[in-house]
Amino acid sequence: MDHTIVHFEIPADQPERAAKFYRELFGWEINRWEGSADGGGGMEYWMVNTVPTNADGMPSRPGVNGGLMRRMMPGQTPVNYIGVADLDEFVRKAERLGAKVLMPKSPVPNMGWFAQLSDTEGNVFAIWQNDAKAGAEGQMAGEKAGNAR
């Protein structure tokens, strides 16, 4: 695996205003995620497509798609998500190298797992692992075989 950026998140005080800004500036397709608020743990979330997607929601040409969400704390900055094959392994490796876990391994149901960390300089980043079974019964963060958490 290349360990490339696979997703980004932009926090906004007024997500609707930010969505309008990016739509008009770059022509991005931005739509409120169906799992938002009611099914997304109360978090308001918009999917941002900077490039077209295929039937699975993956970019159909080079580019990175992401999300836009309501800012949850003052000073919250954009976060890049780096794809890995084994999230648990990379969280352990990052900690050995001096990273701090800010949000432990968490599922995005039917999509994958993520953890947010800060690097040795205090920059926030996230690690992402695709897994269509994430969040399913028996597949919560503490129940997956080999889980570091």
Where do the language-model regions lie?
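Core segments of cupin and vicinal oxygen chelate
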Residues: 2, 9-62
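Vicinal oxygen chelate
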Residues: 5-13, 64-95, 113-118
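N-terminal beta-strand motif that seeds the catalytic metal site of vicinal oxygen chelate
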Residues: 1-20, 25, 77-82, 129-149
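Conserved active-site tyrosine of GNAT-family acetyltransferases
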Residues: 18-22, 94, 122
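Charge-dense, helix-prone N-terminal extensions
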Residues: 24, 28-29, 92-97, 102-104, ...
